[in-house]
Amino acid sequence: MTMNTKSNFLRIFAQPLSDFPSISGVDNDTAHLNKKKILMFDMNALLANAAGVTQSDSRPTKTLDSFPLLPQKSKKRLDVSSQLHLDIGFDTEYVYNPQTKQNDILSYQSYVVLPDGTGVPGILYPASAHKKDRLSLKNFLAKTLTPLLKNEQINEWPGSITLYAHFLRADVASFSDFWSDHKILLKGIRSTVSSFKNRYGIDFDEVENRREKNSLITFDKRTSPPRCSNVTFIDTLLITPGGMGLSECGELLGLPKLTIPAPYSISDMRHYLKGDRRGFEAYALRDAEIAVRYALQVKSFCAESLMITRVPATIGGIGVSRFLKTINESGISSEICMGTRTVTKQCWNPETQGFRTVKTRQSIPARELYETFPINCYHGGRNECYMMGITPEREWYDYDLAGAYTTGLLDILQPDYDNIFHSRNPEDYCGHVMGFALVSFQFPDSVRFPCLPVRTEQFGLFFPLAGESWATAPEIALALSLGAEITIQQGIIVPWHLYESGDVTNSREQECSVFLPFVQQVRENRNRHAKGSLEEKFWKEIGNSLYGKLAQGLHAKTAFDTTRGLNSPLPPSSVTQPFFAAHVTGFVRAVVGELMNALPPNAIVVSVTTDGFLTDVSLENIDMSGPLSSRFQALCDIADPGSSMLTCKHQVRQLVAMKTRGQLTYKESEGFPIVHARAGVKPPADIPRDDYNRYMVDLYINRAPGHKLRRGSLISTRDMWLNESDLVAVESEIRLNLEFDFKRQLITPTMNEGHLLMHSRPWDDMSKALKQRQLFDDWRQTHALKDEADWDDWCDFLYCRNVYTPLKLKVGQNRSDDVLVRLFLRALAQHQWGLTPDDKKRQTSTEVAAWLVAAGYSVTASDVKNAGRAKLPPIIFGSLTSRMNRLMDLIKPVYPGFALPSAVL
């Protein structure tokens, strides 16, 4: 650029914008723009203008035709290399590095299953344990598969690959490129992850041609000729019945998980690798082998028994597909049954640059209009503890309803959504009816176990004697039979199609039972296989999983969305059905409630948990003749002919009752399984599983206020994804909470086995229940309810908050007698509550203070002198606490005229 040009170029910044007509879109109104903004325009025009060169615009003028209605489709996606499919189990071994707070990767294991079933193990070691030397997913697959080509074990590059690991999120983060390329392609499911978009284009040629030290390769890059595969991740944990561990999977396969010999341990695999490389490799490779062999066994099972050619992501998904298939096979329209309709719409697909047809299911108007009722009536199971402490010694039985929810599904016939009607007549909710209502209720005081649930956001379900409840028809019918006064505020009845009688065993009703074909298929297939086999367990899990899918998404439960990095509401499943979910849970709660209320008057119930209860009544003495129990037994006869509706799962001689879901065995009953529910407490890792019960009993008996436990847990999916962390253990301290949860009102304190023992009664109403629960949460911060002195202190604390606090009397850490001392001094100074001027003269302020100090109260002469300044509150005393009675026993001999207003002495 010449000096002339430079000066011309600089000169333009001093000129007004109107001097540059060649700059389109600039007028005098924009003259105030910052000079730097000139650079946003065509700089070539500016430079040409500055140099005195005329520049012509050769670009064609664009018209509307230049912008087509539909953009052109993008280039055709790269095809996969071949039709060959390979299944690969993989695993990693690592040790935690406290300096980096990440894992040092020791090895990557693979176990490739060829099309003929031959297994090829392989193990790869990174150059070092440093994070920079980790293998990428592409490198791992390339180094695993290339030797197979060279050895002619495969003759072409696989077009599709499925990677299997047990608890997938423990291993996928070990790849160097996982967080940059793949983390949004995995979906969070039940604390782990699985593929939900399964195509990754991998240029394996490029990977093989690069050195190990330079493995930073764009995942979607293509070369020519390409080696491109579809890769899918499957977590085998999600396809195990009950979330079995890898060792249990190995046992089912006859392929046991190897053990680590002493002196080595799982906590220091580096030591094992250095000391016994061959043993380390055998142990590591077996885990990868079990994962893929188990998955292929499941795949074979799905193909032969379920007609599904792929390995499902979860067992719950199988349950859904089988249910819909059985409905269609039985001649019932799944849409009519579920109250849905198929809606077709056109959606733009940016990948193909074209429209695609999408079909979705939506509720029909009749269902959508009324489904708020069942959603509000969906509460889950009944969970309560009726005792606190160590029970008397006798036989205690833990009963469960046989297949509670699966059996309960049989109670559902085909609903007639178009004829739903409102009803405020309680009698309409009796019998075999699907109904949902908001009710007001009052049970007689004699009812031990009220059956209408009241939901709280913080503390779960309560069952008080009076209140308001969103209840199902079976619960309303039971409440009426117990003598409750019921007022239906708003309610609906959902009629059955082809309903003819109240007898569920009626053949016409069985034909209409929505879930009968599904339940029969599950039962028949379970019976076809040996008990405890993989197939039998799989069918059992398929049957049990369906209920959860019916209720999925009804309440505001959230799950971490790995694609967005946010906690998102758990979406409904394809069979979410509030009418079915609410009816089944209400029916099961009602059956359990009927059984407990039918027990002999002197029977003791320790607790109830969802579908069963702990009691001292033997099976032959339980009355199962009630209408709801009879109906449930009839359903059991359909599901499993000849079976009993109640099964005894545990039997012990003595129990420790702590709180809801917290019952332990104090003394065993020989030959029977023990009761062991830990209320969410996880024993330390060094405690053997066989010693868990004894550990928990000792922990409960020796607990102290503020007791804290160290808890080791794995980092959550949320924290792992947001922080791009390895799967590492997280240590935390939690406050022990084994105190009673006050879902019931404690009564009759006694001591047994050195610990406080109490029974309970239902709350009169929810206001008392919630207030006392909140106050107890305050009290237990510095106290534990272990003996009669603790009970006395709690009752005193409760009295202070209920009587003194509303009168704005300062309580703080004081107790009822401390406050009464202050009130006594005010009455003495002001000649109130039966005290006279002569009483005031009887002792000096110093003498009164000394007298009370000797009795254990913190009082000074100034307190006595100043007592006349504060007014006495307009208090009316009811019954007194033990502390107040002791104080009155101290005062009355000295001041016999002293009397509390309306006190009961």
Where are these regions (language model features)?
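N-terminal accessory regions of nucleic-acid-interacting proteins
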Residues: T2-I88, T92
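A short acidic-Thr-Gly-centered motif at the start of a beta-strand
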Residues: S66-L86, E152-W157, T372-Y397, N597-L599
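Short acidic, Gly/Ser-rich segments with clustered Asp/Glu that frequently serve as metal-coordination loops
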Residues: T92-T100, L401-T407
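Conserved DEDDh/DEDDy metal-dependent 3′-5′ exonuclease domain
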Residues: T118-D268, Y283-R286
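Acidic, Mg2+-coordinating catalytic module of metal-dependent nucleases/exonucleases
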Residues: I239, G245-W348, V592, D611
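Catalytic palm active-site di-aspartate
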Residues: R286-A288, D398-G403, G543, P601-V617
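C-terminal, non-catalytic extensions of nucleic-acid polymerases
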Residues: K299-M388, E485-A598, A603-I604, T615-L905
